[in-house]
Amino acid sequence: MKKQQKKTKEITAPVYMMNRELSWLKFNERVLNEAGNPGVPLAERLTFAAIYQSNLDEFYRVRVGTLMDQMEASEVIRENKTNMTSEEQVTAILQATRDLEQKKAAIYEQLMGELEPYGVRLINFNRLSAEEGKLLETYFDQEIAPYLSANIVSKQQPFPFLKNKNIYAVASLMSKGGKTKTAIIPCSNTVFRRLIDIPTRKGTFMLSEELILHFLPKMFKNYEIREKALLRITRNADIDTETIYDEDLDYRDAMEKLIKQRRRMNPVRMELSRDLNKKMISSLCKELHVDKEHVFLTRVPLDMSFVFGLQGYLRNTAQDKLFYQRRTPRMTPELDGKSALIPQIMKKDVLLSYPFENIKSFINLLNEAAKDDSVVSIKMTLYRLADKSQIVDALVDAAENGKEVVVLVELRARFDEESNIEYSRKLEEAGCRVIYGLNGYKVHSKLCLISRKTDKGVSYITQIGTGNYNEKTSALYTDLSLITANREIGKEAAEVFAALLKGEVVEKSNLLLVAPKCLQNRVLDMIQEEIDQVKQGKEGYIGIKINSLTDKVIINKLVEASQAGVKIEMVVRGICCLIPEIKGYTENIKVVSIVGRYLEHSRIYRFGTKEREKIYIASADFMTRNTVRRVEVAAPVLNEKLKERLDWMFETMLNDDEKGKRLTETGNYADRSLNDVKLNSQEIFYAMAYSNAEKTQKKRED
């Protein structure tokens, strides 16, 4: 670990602030806890274990990668809430990770044990019979060995490049002449299966990398294998995507260059399946440019994605009771799918709640707009899209039908860059006007504007969402989508697109809150309004549902509101840098985190008591990157019926004591018991969506 060169005076951090990275690790621990939760169906617990690992991989690539880069700076960089240096944060992260990995190993062993009564086992070679060993050896010789490339490190054959998150077998070899050499064998391969079934034992499997590790002597017959282990590295992914706007190249070509650069960045973590001697670990660290503190030993398979293969086996053997009950998002009862949608939306606002309601209603609207003679243009911001996106298909159809189609495709959506590059080409080829993001600001808003020419002039249908235009994630994440024909909202949405087309951002807005210029300041103003209400002897109320809270300016304003006596209730899924319930600071703030079947992703802002409530749905969390470094849009919900629905949803989430955990004054999360029967907000939302759809269907049939 490179030590920072220059010391700075340590500053005392506010007692109500928590470090962002450590708060995120607490969130990922709650994901891991679901893997160990006996109340979750057994096969689904495997999914949570895999999600925990995937989350941690990305965290190391992005967040630890950023901190490691900061440590290269000559000046000490301190985090602005707890004043921890980059080095202090990395040290704390490494220790917290080791604790979590021990917990993961215990949960993994528990899961494997619980699977055995259902006929599923994952074994090592030493648990095979002699007959089974011969069968597996034949399988190795015929199906795996021909596709392996062994590398013995030497002057003629330098240490090979190791791909991010791929699995390798590493061995210390002793030649007949007594010389020690290192061998590296790639184990990640799409040619052979990773999950190998044992033919004599139904439901019993072995991982291909374990088979490769066992049969290394067959590959190095002239050597004695002194030590061996499986290895996986996680590479830094902290690239500066802003540089694409400085290039003379096409933006897409510049981004493709950066993606290639990212693949070769230094590792930030190395995982080993077995302990090796200090000399060999030192050698590997030197070759891979990994600090020894970043080496982790694990008893758990290095890549947990194999669990999806186990789930497939369980499905095929009719073990449905080990899974969540299958759920199909319902079509919203607010729209009659058998009639044209545009006239219905012109009469009333519609709010879709995913995954309880189906994104198909919005896709149907786009398809209708693509063919409707009154529609002159469709403008849309795209961030993360599904494979084979029906939304892109609708935009292509619209362009081919002669509509003006303007699409901002954010090329810098991390790890979706290549997909977005391909979609931008498809849209351009169809005749759409494509904007590749905005210099200085990522465009993260979920905004769609359909403009129509009518006898009374131009009319608008505007859709504002909290989540991506992605059919896959709309069935997995909780999100909200407002569709409205409100003229003023439409005009302001048009101003957002006009600014984007000029490479600018909106400087002023009235109904919409539009970052980076007019979201944070408007939120602060509304918090101040609640403070003023309390000072006048009235009640003040703030309700916030977001994924993360890191914006120091907003945090300090919320603390000020709490100190003034404003009641503040928040549902914050992930990072929460504000510690609630601290006397004298945050005693009027309550924070709940929900980690359940679906990923909580919707954002709701509520300001004011019932009779004067303002309520918004938004694409923005209260993170500095969202409030001042991105283009984000929050839209007011003006329809009273929809406001009541959002109020009910918010209150239901606050009262969730099955999946909702309370953030305490210690900075830790605690179980709650609020109801005679445990309340699961996601289950209630699905039951309500199902009931409403059934009632409406019956009513229409009558």
Name each model feature, range by range:
Residues 552-559:
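Glycine/threonine-rich ATP-lid/beta-loop region of ATP-binding domains
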